[in-house]
Amino acid sequence: MIAPGRLNVHGALNPNGKFVVYWMTSARRAHWNHALEHAVDLANQHRQPLIVIECLALNHRWANDRISTFVLQGMIDNRAAFAQTGVTYIPYVETAKKEASGLLEVWLQQATACVIDDFPTYYPRHVLETALQFNTCELHVVDSNGFMAMRAQGRNFTTAYSLRRHLHKTILEHMYEFPLANPLDNAKDLPMIEATLIEDIFAKSNTPLTPYEYLWRVAEGGDIGKNALSKLNIDHTVPPVLTKKGGSVEARRRWKEFLSKRLINYNEMRNQPQERGASGISPWLHFGHIGVHQIINEIFTAYRWDVSMVTPPNDGRRNGWWGLPEPVEAFLDQIITWRDIGFIHCAMIPDHTEFSSLPQWAQTTLAEHSTDERPYVYTLEQFEEAQTHDPLWNAAQQQLRQEGIIHNYLRMLWGKKILEWSPDPQTAMRWMIALNDRWALDGRDPNSYTGIGWVLGKFDRGWTEREVFGKIRCMTSASTMRKFKTKAYIEKYSQGQTQQTVLGSGPSLYTAHQ
């Protein structure tokens, strides 16, 4: 049974409903999933079939080959995970914009109850808002996102310090909110839905079913995937990243490799651009292919941690209170404090992508310096093509284009320079969001938007006043290059580097990972 703070129920049960449906929009996994666990419980309670529907929609601004490939690779894993479990899993790919505009409504008309993910931003939020309008069955909105339930804390946190103090004080109650590792174990005795009913519902909404063969072709990558994607009305100029395969299988492989080999050096190596010091799992977290509770549980198990090891005082410090080695505490601060502050903020502040969501002091100081002469001023196109005077910034932008991520520390520098080299701070914020949403595998995410907000003063304090930045914290490429070894990083992501592993030409690179 999930914690009450993770569940909001709307509407009434449909007395004529034939099944329970879980509309999977963000927690795209079969394990460690509060929403799936709750859906199984509901289906058992009503003694009805459970149908899980996972969609790839095209009707959003940044639909492209990169995002689509990653999601469809996750569908392949989910199809295998749901096989022979007592739950019917239906992956659906929209082949034309608004093709499936009536699909959700028709399913809800025939459902006793619907479970849907609670994700506070971008397209999953739009789907949730749409579902709330229908009012044809009981709608269960479930938060499977962070260590802390994002709406249950009752407040927005303006600093990491304030969230750490809250977490330190309430840690015990959060330890009771872990979902089941394998919620499908409780679905074995559920009745199955008739195939003809599924076909009838799709037909009624004028929506074609997606053949498995199509999922497989996209997931293969290379020329096979490229040809399959060409039929979709999406942006084909943002290619898949063939070195990053979507799905729960790859997510768990990468996480376990980090846990066993690199976590112990995390605090020393994570900010080194030339090292693989960070976990690198943010794309899989964003798409819900792995859950934060699995990660935290496996850390606690590996280090034999329990809540009795928490030490006073409750003073908001970054480390030293978990009772764990320093690198482990540093990682927990990222995966809990900084990740949860983003989800809580976006849940509490609906207009979190707007300039007006910045702290008042930040808006004021940026306004006071908005007419300062910039050392350089670039267009959005110049930023996107990595055509600035700064080799380190260009390398970070090339990494974003080629790999769908930017190294943790350099992502902060990337944003600070866009602020400095844009015509004004409002434009800088819009451009950061556009570049990151379009190219980043972990874009369109609460942590993306709060990270960009941090560049502009969110979750921070005022610093020494200077030109352009005002009292916003400043970062420079020169100081970064003095702190860290960046030569190899710049060379790796230089403009002339071959793009074969990005553009999808040639044979699939995924076969070796399967």
Model-predicted regions and their roles:
Residues 1-190, 398, 417-427, 431-451, ...:
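Trp/Phe/Arg-rich N-terminal binding region typifying the photolyase-homology
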Residues 4-13, 46, 67-74, 237-239, ...:
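Short low-complexity stretches enriched in small and charged residues
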Residues 16, 149, 156-357, 488-514:
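Glycine/tryptophan-enriched, flexible segments
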Residues 19-34, 51-59, 203, 242-251, ...:
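Short charge-dense sequence patches
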Residues 73, 137, 193, 246, ...:
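Short coil/turn linker and secondary-structure boundary residues
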Residues 120, 145, 167, 259, ...:
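A broadly conserved detector of short glycine/acidic/proline-rich loop/turn motifs that flank catalytic sites
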Residues 272-490, 494-496:
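Active-site-proximal binding-pocket segments
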